């Protein structure tokens, strides 16, 4: 935000690490090493296309990490693919609930949605939030609003301990608010 323009889009794939790489993830390193670069983690190729359209109009650099299983999924292509935008820094609530907030991104979103549906069958109402963008992170503080409603949160990803999950928790608990709007402590 210092006024310098750096319109650059870096496209790569990630998530769902396999083989000898299954125990490693670069997300923790990326979010700590690339400050000033938008780090975007779409859950599917439609969302990725929206990020590309958004970043093509931006003067800021962006790293778009496409999920590997997104290449294999059949998706309904939007009729406005060239105009479709995915906003940077804005989370998307993909399932509303009242008992627990599940926060995730990228390829784990499908797994979390399946788990939320299984929880619902057991009488537990889970709200699912797709972060979509690690940097910037939840600029509208929607995760805190959800936690205020459910009083419980679980952060889910495939990163190593201390990586993106720790980053998301720190962003929500320390930087966004340690109290919700009702003055109740968020733990």
Which residue ranges define each predicted feature?
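Thiamine diphosphate
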Residues: 3-6, 68-187
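Conserved thiamine diphosphate
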Residues: 1-101, 110, 126
């Amino acid at each position: 935000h210092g006024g310098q323009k750096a319109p650059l889009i870096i496209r790569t794939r990630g998530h769902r690490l396999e083989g000898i790489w299954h125990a490693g993830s670069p997300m923790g390193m990326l979010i700590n090493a690339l400050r000033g670069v938008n780090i975007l983690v779409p859950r599917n190729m439609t969302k990725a296309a929206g990020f590309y359209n958004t970043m093509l109009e931006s003067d800021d650099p962006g790293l778009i990490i496409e999920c590997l299983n997104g290449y294999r999924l059949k998706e309904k292509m939007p009729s406005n693919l060239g105009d479709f935008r995915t906003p940077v820094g804005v989370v998307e609530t993909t399932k509303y609930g009242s008992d627990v907030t599940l926060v995730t991104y990228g390829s784990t979103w499908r797994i979390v949605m399946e788990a939320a549906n299984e929880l619902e069958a057991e009488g537990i109402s889970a709200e699912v939030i797709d972060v979509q963008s690690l940097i910037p992170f939840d600029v509208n503080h929607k995760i805190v609003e959800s936690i205020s409603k459910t009083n419980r949160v679980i952060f889910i990803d495939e990163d190593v301990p201390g990586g993106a999950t720790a980053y998301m928790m720190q962003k929500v608990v320390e930087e966004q608010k340690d109290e919700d709007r009702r003055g109740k402590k968020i733990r």
